[in-house]
Amino acid sequence: MTNVSADSILGALLGTAVGDALGMPIEGLSHQNVRTYYKGIKEYRDDDQRGDLSAGQWTDDTQMTFALVRVLTKFPDRPAAWPSAAVEEYVRLRSEARRWGNTTTTAIDRLAGGTSPAESGVPDRATDGAAMRAAPLGIWWATQDVDRDDAFEAVRPVLAVTHRHPVALVAGWGQAAAVHTLLAQSPDTFERAAFWDAMLEAATWAEAQLDATDRVSSRLQNLTDRLDAFPLDLRDACDGVGVRAEEAWPFACAMVARRAHLLENTLLSGINVGGDADTTGAMMGAMLGALHGWAAFPSEWQKGLEAADRLSEEARGLSEVLG
């Protein structure tokens, strides 16, 4: 159990939303098209191509993350209640869905039709939707007196409500473990090698628990000696930065490990690689926020974020009940 500051918790949660909003306009674009259409992302921008969202607005990454914030705030001591509570939150959000991925949409449609949360998750799509929403679970783990086995038994079922593929769950567990690890550190105490070893160990352990292939841990291993490489080279080492869990999450981890002390530079550099940029942005934002705290984010990012007051209130509510 770690003595976690409220600012660090806000950093992990609101950092998710900031990264999501920065990446929103270029979601799905190649790096070349990011350069062509946007000349690179340096601030919140309207989505000029799709025209559906404006500068500072966020997508499903933030919707799903804060759905879990509300679940954990309501049931901080009852992980067994989380899957059913998540169902209520997810189904309620259907009318407000923002760019939900196919995996999430399929699962929540099943839930709305009466499928149980134990069976609703999609078992054959190894996408990154579990990882994108895992920050609140890492916060919960960091603030509770639970060991790794108990934390895993709490985290896995609620992520599996939408994503049951073992590789998706490995990445989801990895993101929770990353936030858990970084909440115990600061930019001054961060050690890259120790962080990377922890991420590789977390992925390898989860793969064993889930009887999963080594698609996540092998990507991390492939990145081990390349953490000073350029972002585009890290992308290539991951075989891309699309929606596959074994691409997006290892890339986000590598970007944070590469320059963890540079919050703004790291987040923008990773997002501008393109691909599933709102989700890699959300995951990087959560990790960097856990390490640096919310106060370290640029004021224009704080003020320009959609519904910042509501998100801050919900994040503070979780911080208080976990206190």
Which positions does each model-derived feature cover?
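Structured, active/binding-site neighborhoods that engage oxygen-rich ligands
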Residues: 1-323
